[in-house]
Regions:
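Glycine-rich phosphate/pyrophosphate-binding beta-alpha loops
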Residues: 2, 99-103, 170-176, 192-206, ...
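Central helical "cap/lid" subdomain
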Residues: 41, 45-91, 491, 506-509
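Helix-loop-beta segment of a Rossmann-like dinucleotide-binding subdomain
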Residues: 1-16, 37-38, 128-137, 190-198
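Helical element adjacent to the flavin cofactor pocket in flavoenzyme catalytic cores
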Residues: 1-50
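Mid-domain catalytic core of redox enzymes
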Residues: 66, 80-122, 143-144, 151, ...
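Glycine/proline-enriched, intrinsically flexible loops and inter-domain linkers
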Residues: 224-225, 231-622
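Conserved positions in beta-strands of structured domains
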Residues: 27-30, 166, 184, 387, ...
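C-terminal catalytic lobe of FAD-dependent flavoproteins
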Residues: 99, 108, 132, 136-272
Length: 622
């Protein structure tokens, strides 16, 4: 019972010294610079070092007033309550029927019936704001929904047909862009935490959520991998009314819909388009959305590029096979524009990077360093490449989904003043990977790409079409290749050059599915799946990217020093299934158990079908 639970929690909290002020209206979040200072209320000002925003559906507009992005929005939500039913047991589990979007539970001797609408309606859509006095507000009951709800309930719970309905309810409930919670410290204000966006399961999650946020505040980080709940997984555009209102009409129903592998959300699309989006579409690209960008997932050869979801064979396998094999044996084009791009410069830039990064950052123009950023416990907070563009000027490249998270981690841990600039939208990035990439680039741009002139992990500017273009000899698939960073306005000029010559070389346009398979074959790791804040570099096979020889200390060094000579508790390895199954039989994704002598010894982190080895492969900690 939510009411009894809330009362008991408040009583227990008061016994521990917590002060609760009722009928206390928030007027303003107080901050000094980008750090929290307190809250101003109608009962006075409370000065404090930390604030946790737990305002439910009001959280977005409270955050907005303080300059903080909180991506949630309320939709109309329905339930009804029957009359008393004397044969109803007092303790019953919550009943869910995903096929009909229906749920039911015991409620004081009555039956409560609700529905997670497959096509939800926004609340307050005219104003985009929740009224301050709407705590117990209701909407006019939609008779069509109520009739449908009653009919569905009667089919699953026949006794409902003979019970009178005492209460019909329609009210607001807030939802997030991906149906996950919003927790942790915000990127905009230091020590301003959030705990909201529970998508209708806040009561059941309250104990664990409160404990987790409290530990997060005390330690400044969490050793658990909570990125899927961290508010910093989102960017500013995710909380814009244009995005959030449309997206939450879909995510509400998705809670009860089939959770298909590789499912792409359909709402709030085309937020960020690649410079050559139309060209890729003509080439057969099937797009998915990542960090707001429409990214080519695969390229259809002769059919309409759309997903047909399945727990077996995937309809994009044939395209991915062609893309993988042609890239391994010849040449593949990959769009990498959504890569996050930060630039750090100033006299303290190198010193600060040495403190932030576990590896020894090269301070030589054109040199690149693969490294991780750690938390004080030695867990991996970020996976990145740092390139020295010139003295005291560096560019950081990291995964698209980690933009807000990594930016926050860097700025929060800087000890000295530097210039930090997010240049993600200023440059596109094209990956040309495969054994013929050197030959292709030489014919296209000139004799700049020989082994001697362009060693591995080096970068340099070339003047192409009256523009400075940065070429970097790196590849996320373990083949010869270059990443090409182009000023966004010049991208189409260079893309046309690549496209024209690509016909001669049988260049394959390749999507994210192929990239994932190719990197997995070479045991290249993906942050958020294979490495997280729960994993340290030693167990992840990344000890080569940790430098204990550099003079500077770095975040997490003390923790690593304590464990570097101790036996590993687990280790990341690449596995393949012994038998050569057909693609999709079985379909491996992630979190599959690894057995030894009939005992589970680990779980996979990334899995896919390798068309080079013709078998299922996976990365797993054992």
């Amino acid at each position: 019972d939510p009411e009894i639970l809330t009362k008991n929690i408040s009583i227990a909290a008061k016994k521990k010294g917590v002060k609760i002020f009722e009928k206390c209206k928030l007027k303003k979040i107080l901050k000094r610079g980008n750090q929290i200072r307190g809250v101003k209320t109608n009962l006075g000002t409370i000065n404090c070092e930390y604030v946790v925003l737990c305002a439910g559906m009001w959280s977005r507009q409270i955050g907005e007033a303080a300059g903080v992005s909180i991506p949630l929005y309320p939709n109309e939500h329905f339930y009804m309550i029957t009359e008393n039913y004397r044969n109803l047991p007092k303790i019953l589990p919550t009943f869910r029927d995903p096929d009909t979007y229906l749920y039911a539970r015991e409620y004081h001797g009555k039956i409560m019936l609700g529905i997670f609408e497959p096509n939800a309606k926004n609340a307050f859509k005219d104003t985009g704001k929740v009224p301050n006095n709407f705590s117990f507000g209701e909407f006019k009951v939609n008779k069509k929904y109520i009739k449908m709800l009653h009919q569905l309930a009667a089919k699953r719970i026949p006794v409902v047909k003979d019970l009178k309905i005492e209460k019909y309810f329609s009210g607001p409930e807030s939802f997030t862009p991906d149906s996950n919670f919003l927790m942790g410290e915000t990127q905009e204000i230091k020590n301003f935490y959030v705990c909201c966006g529970f998508n209708s399961i806040g009561i059941g999650s309250s104990g664990g959520a409160g404990k987790t946020v409290a530990e997060w505040m005390i330690r400044g980080h969490t050793d658990q991998d909570l990125f899927s709940l961290d508010v910093k997984r989102f960017e500013k555009f995710n909380s814009s009314l244009r995005f959030i209102k449309e997206r939450t009409t879909e995510t509400l129903g998705n809670l009860f819909k089939m959770h298909w592998p590789y499912k792409q959300l359909e709402t709030s699309r085309n937020i960020k388009l690649l410079p050559y989006h139309k060209e890729l579409k003509k080439l057969g690209a099937c797009f998915g959305q990542m960090a707001g960008y429409e990214r080519p997932m695969w390229f259809s050869k002769n059919k309409k590029p759309s997903y047909k979801y399945s727990y077996g064979y995937q309809n994009w396998y044939q395209s991915a096979k062609s893309e993988c094999l042609n890239t391994r044996n010849n040449l593949g084009f990959f769009d990498l524009t959504p890569f996050v791009k930060f630039e750090i410069s100033g006299k303290n830039a190198h010193e600060q990077l040495q403190y932030l990064c576990a590896n020894n950052i090269k301070h030589i123009e054109g040199r690149s360093t693969y490294t991780q950023m750690l938390n004080p416990s030695g867990g991996i907070e970020a996976d990145l490449t740092v390139s020295c563009l010139k003295k005291n000027h560096f560019r950081i490249i990291c995964p698209a989904l980690a933009r807000s998270h990594n930016k926050s981690h860097i700025l929060k841990n800087l000890k000295k003043k530097i210039k930090f600039e997010d240049v993600t939208e200023k440059y596109s990035c094209i990956g040309l990977f495969g054994p013929n990439s050197r030959k292709f680039l030489t014919e296209l741009f000139g004799n700049f790409f020989s082994k001697e002139d362009f060693p591995f992990s080096r970068g340099k500017y070339l003047d192409i079409s009256n523009s400075k273009v940065w070429f970097q000899r790196l590849s996320f698939i373990g083949e010869l290749g270059w990443e090409i960073y182009i000023p966004i306005k010049k991208t189409n000029i260079i893309f046309k050059k690549i496209k024209n010559l690509g016909k001669k070389f049988n260049l394959s346009y390749s999507g994210m599915h192929a990239l994932d398979i190719l990197r997995l074959e070479k045991k290249f790791l993906h942050w958020g799946h294979d490495i997280t804040s729960e994993n340290n570099p030693f167990e992840s096979g990344l000890a080569f990217a940790v430098s204990f020889k550099k003079n500077e200390s770095f975040i997490g060094r003390d923790a690593l020093e304590k464990i570097k000579n101790k036996p590993l508790k687990k280790k990341l390895e690449l596995f393949s299934l012994k038998n050569r199954f057909k693609p999709g039989k079985p379909l491996l994704l992630h979190d599959e158990p690894i057995y030894k002598d009939d005992k589970i010894v680990g779980y996979s982190t990334s899995s896919n079908y390798s068309f080079c080895y013709n078998k299922n492969i996976c990365l797993a900690y054992i």
